[in-house]
Amino acid sequence: MRFDPREIGEVLEMLLFRELDIRAVTLSVNTLPAIRPNLKDTLDALSHLLEPYARRLRPAAEKVASKLGVRIVTVRLAVSPTSIMLEPLGDAKAAVEIAAFLDKLAGRHGVDMVGGFSAFVHGGVSRGAAALIESLAEALNSTERVAGFLNAASTMTGINLEAVRRAARIVLSLKPHAAARFAVTSNLPEDVPFMPGAYHGLGQPDAVVNIAVSGPGVIEAVVRSLPDADVRTLHDAIKRAAFKITRLGELVGREVAKELGVAFGAVDLSVAPSPKVGDSVAAVLEAMGLPRVGAPGSVFALALFTDAVKKGGAMAASTIGGLSGAFIPVSEDAVMAQAAAEGAITLDGLKAMAAVCNTGLDMVGIPADVGPDVVAAIIADVMALAVHLDKPLGVRLIPVPGARPGDFYDLGGLYGRVAVVDASRYSRIPLVARPGTAPPGVERLKKG
């Protein structure tokens, strides 16, 4: 990989003045060899397997960060879906113990999060998945670093409404900090570096590094420098900035993988915001010409932005992976959160934007007294978009006790301030109480 002096200078400016960083180095590890018929042997095998990786992950990332002069915000582990490990155990209490083990392992070695406490239930619920589902609320409420998801829909199988309903009940039983580590997903790829969607895919090598990038402040500066540019010029400028951001992610990923002696996987092209000033995707959209994110034109602006990021990033990475598009996590983007609190952007507006981004409804606050029918229906709406557009999407809702629309709840750190939105004027939605799985759409027929 070669860099010319001008490109190096541009990247240095981004690092020093535009909040450019690497959002996450995620080491994904195959934990299926640790499957055992009893809990004690499972935990012993997990410890033997994961300790060497966990011990070396942060030192390797810090060495690369120091060498390159790049800030790496978080280091993360991802494990094989825990539901698979629970198949011989079939016990929710065992699942809680595994979550506690992963949490302590991460804390002991300075790993910020562990993903993969998850199950794929888009076609049905297996014995291990049932145990995991039963454990999720207790496991996430009692840990700090464990993240998980339920994949409740796919283009190939449709939408499992029973899984959607169970996921809704889980969401409403989670404390706000725990809810930030849980998502309901669809069509989830195997190499996601972002939480809570990270897990070790069945088609991956035993250990692989995947990279999540950031940099909306870089793109905002570029957009603001072109106030009178035509749309094609604006698109091209965003594309070129995304290229530079992704090149940095590729370089860091290769170096960390080399330090760890594992495979380098992919760069997730998604430009992730943070609660910091000058690090907002919503601010980019407003710089493009929106009076406020959520105003008419927001879907168009986000589509233009996402397309440019994908095209620029794809040229810069040897392999693209994960979700690769644009992130609009409401609480993690200070400008987006403020717009939501003001009512400029609504739940339905966010659903519309989900059609052209890659996160779905992410980090959206809702009153904790909302009924499970409403939460299930919100999830089902996003699952329907994912299935019929054949794309990965997720739902990460934060129930806030005693809150009303327009209120904030401060989660702190990268999670930011959760803006609570109006979820629904209705309390019962009988449609989502119907049993069964909604069949896949016409997109399924195109796949043979």
Curated annotation (Swiss-Prot):
InterPro entries according to UniProt: UPF0210
Cysteine disulfide partners in this protein: none
SUPFAM superfamilies: PFL-like glycyl radical enzymes (SSF51998)
Gene3D superfamilies according to UniProt: 3.20.70.20
Record-stated family: Belongs to the UPF0210 family.
NCBIfam families: PRK05313.1
Protein name: UPF0210 protein Pars_1033
